[in-house]
From Swiss-Prot:
This is Protein D345L. Interacts with IKKA/CHUK and IKBKB. Plays a role in the negative regulation of host NF-kappa-B signaling pathway. Mechanistically, recruits IKKA/CHUK and IKBKB to suppress their kinase activity towards NFKBIA. GO terms for biological process: symbiont-mediated suppression of host NF-kappaB cascade. It comes from African swine fever virus (isolate Tick/South Africa/Pretoriuskop Pr4/1996).
Length: 345
């Protein structure tokens, strides 16, 4: 696993300008559900228009900031709960090296997990499993992390995330299993941190269970800031949403993370404010590699790239785009979509 990750140490770092530029010319793992007709929120043709720069992405900036903030926390918790280390969380895997030019994947990382065998099945070993296993083995896995802002968490992988995971597995030959990590975080004031269910109930519904862990996210200005830090964990829902949208402008702020179970605010310069977090659900769902996934779906990726090239090369991109939308049928039939969803779930 380490040798494989090192192959991409010089690739564009995730969320860098170079990474954004490359992704604009490729079909990334997160684009796949849309072009395969599995994304209920975005279609093949909307994705095509975005890649062709015909209009800007309609981003939910608050939800994007939330996911980015808590991706790092989720990695820390995964390392703690599974006694592992996540690597390769900043690489970009270009599919050209495997014969899939124009396709790429930017995984949330790779790590080793211990599987324990009991009652005729294998399960992922965590610090919460007080089990004497008949046998154990350690395997490398691909990591995909989601931290929904307000979507309810279910004990399964949403079908529109499966293509992203299968893409990462297909472009990672040494890895045969992925894990889908989904966590439910809640915001709280600093005074609410600790072994209790208290959270900011203006932002989230009340919780009745105790948290698995908690910590502090500190927000610092990149400019000199001398005002007293604010406890953002006590804001009302709308003001906190506005804060998340402000944090989307990453060049204005730096983010610092406490270790899990910290309750004291750190002392550092230019602190604008901080807020506490608690995690109440932390799911780790195994996903096995589907060997034929990328081979079967690559023709649709190629069709998308041809459409994209046609639009970009046209002297009238919008007119060409409209012709493509009007003249082509959906890349997948309804039956294909149903069959593909059944295959992955």
């Amino acid at each position: 696993m380490e040798t494989f990750v090192c192959l991409f140490k010089d690739s564009p770092q995730q969320r860098s300008d170079a990474w954004h530029a490359v992704r604009h010319t490729q079909v990334g793992g997160s684009d796949l559900a849309s072009i395969l007709g599995l994304n209920p929120y975005k279609s093949y043709y909307i994705t095509l228009a975005e890649k062709a720069n015909l209009f800007k992405k309609n981003l939910n900036r608050a939800a994007c900031s939330w996911g980015t903030l808590f991706e790092r926390v989720s990695k820390d918790l995964l390392e703690l709960f599974c006694q592992t280390t996540v690597i390769g969380d900043n690489i970009h895997i270009d599919g050209t090296y495997l014969g899939y030019p124009g396709h790429s994947n930017s995984p949330d990382g790779f790590c080793y997990l211990t599987l324990g065998y009991t009652q005729q099945s294998w399960e992922i070993k965590t610090i919460f499993n007080n089990v004497c296993y008949e046998a154990t083995k350690r395997i490398p896995v691909l990591v995909e992390i989601k931290s929904p802002y307000n979507r309810k968490i279910k004990n399964s992988v949403p079908s529109y995330y499966m293509p992203q995971i299968q893409s990462g597995l297909a472009l990672s030959p040494p890895i045969s299993m992925g894990i889908y990590v989904e966590a439910m975080f809640r915001v709280c004031g600093i005074h609410q941190l600790g072994w209790n269910s208290e959270t900011n109930i203006d932002i989230h519904p009340p919780e009745s269970m105790l948290p698995l862990a908690w910590g502090i996210i500190t927000i610092c200005s990149t400019q000199e800031h001398t005002e007293a830090p604010q406890d953002f964990g006590t804001l009302d829902a709308e003001t906190f949403r506005q804060l998340l949208e402000t944090l989307y402008q990453k060049d204005q702020y730096t983010i610092h993370y406490s270790m899990p179970y910290e309750t004291a605010c750190p002392e550092m310069p230019n602190v604008v404010g901080y807020f506490g977090w608690k995690v109440f659900i932390f799911q780790i769902i195994p996903v096995m590699k589907h060997p034929q996934f990328l081979k079967d779906k690559y023709p649709i990726i190629q069709q998308f790239l041809r459409d994209l090239h046609t639009i970009k090369a046209s002297p009238s991109p919008m007119e060409t785009y409209e012709k493509i939308c009007c003249s082509e049928e959906s890349p997948l039939s309804t039956e294909d979509i149903d069959n593909f969803t059944d295959m992955l779930t």
